[in-house]
């Protein structure tokens, strides 16, 4: 049996971000020999479980929500401190602990979201309006990162499709485009490309309209019974549990119904690595690592990290497979 090749930082980190990190370290005069751990997804995971200076999320406000039985999956939850302390949110830094450390000052009071485009009723709503208009419910979802780690999270929100129906899309609407807040003063990664991984900001994402209308697609305002902390995408983020986590755009300010497929940030950055669809698929590897298995982040320490098989559509094939009937999932990854 041949030995499995060891993963390097370049193997598990997007190439553009990998080289940005190297530039940052060089600018700071930090050499490889002086680093205790390489800054990549695997090392971030190791340092997290060591418990060194783990950042604490700011306290959230309690939310009122229902718990529909159909959405309370009997799965082992990832502990709250790991859900809120191990994140990708490059607007606040490249390492997993950076968002919790740097996002605490994000101003979310009076936050507004604009819904427009190919709709009969364009409207701007603040976050309180959304919560009052669309009753909240808790849904326990699997979450799978493209970096081959996973969590199980009790999100609180409402179906994206309900908001879309409220805006009354017209016959030209075929896709839904999303945009994150653009505020370099609050989000240092937008101001400094070394901090933000060299991505083009604001962060943008998109779905086909039928994907957006699927009941699984959730506009999320809370987690673990409280409002979202900034590092998790406060005050409003998208959750599409059958897709890789980078599709879950955070801190949304604009939702637009459009005719043509919208650009998406990671697809623009590295189209050979990150497709528009980004459906979880154990049979379609990332060009630099396998997607056949994943590391589940649970309640244990580093020795207890569970490696498990990746499920097609992250275990939600029954609900979403029909959306892609006749579509080559290798070509349309």
Curated annotation (Swiss-Prot):
Its EC number is 1.8.5.-. Predicted to be exported by the Tat system. The position of the signal peptide cleavage has not been experimentally proven. GO terms for molecular function: metal ion binding; molybdopterin cofactor binding; oxidoreductase activity, acting on a sulfur group of donors, quinone or similar compound as acceptor. Its cofactor is Mo-molybdopterin. Keywords: Metal-binding, Molybdenum, Oxidoreductase, Periplasm, Signal. It is found in: Periplasm. It catalyses: L-methionyl-[protein] + a quinone + H2O = L-methionyl-(S)-S-oxide-[protein] + a quinol; L-methionyl-[protein] + a quinone + H2O = L-methionyl-(R)-S-oxide-[protein] + a quinol. PROSITE patterns: TAT. Residues 1-43 form the signal peptide. GO terms for cellular component: periplasmic space. Gene3D superfamilies: Oxidoreductase, molybdopterin-binding domain (3.90.420.10). Mo-molybdopterin binds at residues 87, 90-91, 145, 180, 232, 237, 248-250. Coiled coil: none annotated. InterPro entries: MsrP, OxRdtase_Mopterin-bd_dom, OxRdtase_Mopterin-bd_sf, TAT_signal. It is an enzyme of class 1 (oxidoreductase). One of its GO terms (biological process) is protein repair. Its main location: periplasm. Belongs to the MsrP family. NCBIfam families: PRK05363.1. PANTHER family: PROTEIN-METHIONINE-SULFOXIDE REDUCTASE (PTHR43032), PROTEIN-METHIONINE-SULFOXIDE REDUCTASE CATALYTIC SUBUNIT MSRP (PTHR43032:SF3). Part of the MsrPQ system that repairs oxidized periplasmic proteins containing methionine sulfoxide residues (Met-O), using respiratory chain electrons. Thus protects these proteins from oxidative-stress damage caused by reactive species of oxygen and chlorine generated by the host defense mechanisms. MsrPQ is essential for the maintenance of envelope integrity under bleach stress, rescuing a wide series of structurally unrelated periplasmic proteins from methionine oxidation. This is Protein-methionine-sulfoxide reductase catalytic subunit MsrP. It comes from Serratia proteamaculans (strain 568). The lineage of its organism: Bacteria, Pseudomonadati, Pseudomonadota, Gammaproteobacteria, Enterobacterales.
